[in-house]
């Protein structure tokens, strides 16, 4: 649903390709309710006059891996054009830290196969300052990252990471994250 709006608003051929290819499997996907939420963009689709761009690009044409060093995110896929056979890894080590709506999850990863989560962050946001949000959802322990002597990462702009090195190859790809600024070493002394 969001890809459809992105395709229309930004005239984005890749978002249009995603919508087209998903609709090949489920032609009614855009007319189904999405968790009964108003954010499913039904109203947008009913009122917009913007057309979705033509299906001119295929997802197979995208690179299997992409690292966005400026934001500290990386995505790696095995078969991006066929999501039912695709293994995907997402990685985050962000120079923006864990401020505002961000989480203390530097050097965290998530894995998916066939569009379904295999290793994924736990928890959900119930309120910005409730115990669950502070001790689980926003905390490092709720993500696929390491704790140092049982301690999580800093929450704030000072708790940042970055991606100093990565490689995108035909047979193997990797990403290295440096989260040393996200961890307080004072408790180790």
Residue ranges and their predicted role:
Residues 1-38:
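C-terminal, helix-dominated tail/subdomain
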Residues 29-189:
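Catalytic and substrate-binding regions of extracellular carbohydrate-active enzymes
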